[in-house]
Swiss-Prot record:
This is Imidazoleglycerol-phosphate dehydratase 1, chloroplastic. The keyword Kinase does not apply. PANTHER family: IMIDAZOLEGLYCEROL-PHOSPHATE DEHYDRATASE, IMIDAZOLEGLYCEROL-PHOSPHATE DEHYDRATASE HIS7. SUPFAM superfamilies: Ribosomal protein S5 domain 2-like (SSF54211). It comes from the Eukaryota. The gene is HISN5A. It comes from Arabidopsis thaliana.
Length: 270
């Protein structure tokens, strides 16, 4: 009886163990290596896999190079030295609006700050000149250097918008600026500044500044006064509108895919 009972217990335990034992399917019996899903490239012949990996490395390298180039920004740097002035200018078109100007002409420094801040350009200007005579030569040579720096920073002008248009108010003053980075220098200037000076700055030098900048940058620039009575407001609104229009023109258009924005396929001074 005891042997019979023990046998029954063992038989019952064995049945219970079988019920509790996890059931293994066919997939559980396969080697672990066989369960790894092969990628498309792993099923390719060895020489094709090597070529695919090479293309991937090249793509990553090009992407890194492009990112590095964008990080550096489009920068133009110019040094102009004459018997009258010593001027250095550096402009980053892809900057953040850093203004760093010391021209020896306080009001002009204030206007260059507007160019940097509202254009989101990094503008570095250092100048010494014969300001003991007047501001004419320093004002002119700074503008010539800025125009040349813009020309260098733009390069072949691939992918840019090319055109810029902006109207800026400053209290009672309202100034409209329209420009084209065409490679053809032209200035249309229509400001009526009521006073001869703002501080020590001769207001006649505003037109001369933009004419000099146009000559070396090769841009077509139109400046129109729609309203304004205060000389400071008129001039400052002009620089703000110019900065915003230039920012618009120099920014890249992703739809262009890096092509030159001209039906001729080229934008140049010649």
């Amino acid at each position: 009886m005891e042997l019979s009972s023990a046998s029954a217990i063992l038989s019952h335990s064995s049945s219970a163990a079988q019920l509790l034992r996890p059931k293994l399917g066919f997939i559980d019996l396969l080697p672990r290596r066989a369960m790894i899903v092969s990628s498309p490239s792993s099923s390719l012949p060895r020489f094709l896999r090597m070529e695919s990996q090479s293309q991937l490395r090249q793509s990553i390298s090009c992407s890194a190079s492009s990112s590095s180039s964008m990080a550096l920004g489009r920068i133009g740097e110019v040094k102009r030295v004459t018997k009258e002035t010593n001027v250095s200018v550096k402009i980053n078109l892809d900057g953040t609006g850093v203004a760093d100007s010391s021209s020896g002409i306080p009001f002009l420094d204030h206007m260059l700050d507007q160019l940097a801040s509202h254009g989101l350009f990094d503008v570095h200007v250092r100048a010494t000149g014969d300001v003991h005579i007047d501001d004419h030569h320093t004002n002119e040579d700074i503008a010539l250097a800025i125009g040349t720096a813009l020309l260098k920073a733009l390069g072949e002008r691939k992918g840019i918008n090319r055109f810029g248009d902006f109207t800026a108010p400053l209290d009672e003053a309202l100034i409209h600026v329209s420009l084209d980075l065409s490679g053809r220098p032209y200035l249309g200037y229509n400001l009526e500044i009521p006073t001869q000076r703002v501080g020590t700055y001769d207001t006649q030098l505003v037109e001369h500044f933009f004419q000099s900048l146009v000559n070396t940058s090769g841009m077509t620039l139109h400046i129109r006064q729609l309203a304004g009575e205060n000389s400071h407001h008129i001039i400052e609104a002009t620089f703000k509108a110019f900065a915003r229009a230039l920012r618009q023109a120099t920014e890249t258009d992703p739809r262009r895919g890096g092509t030159i924005p001209s039906s001729k396929g080229v934008l140049s001074r010649s």
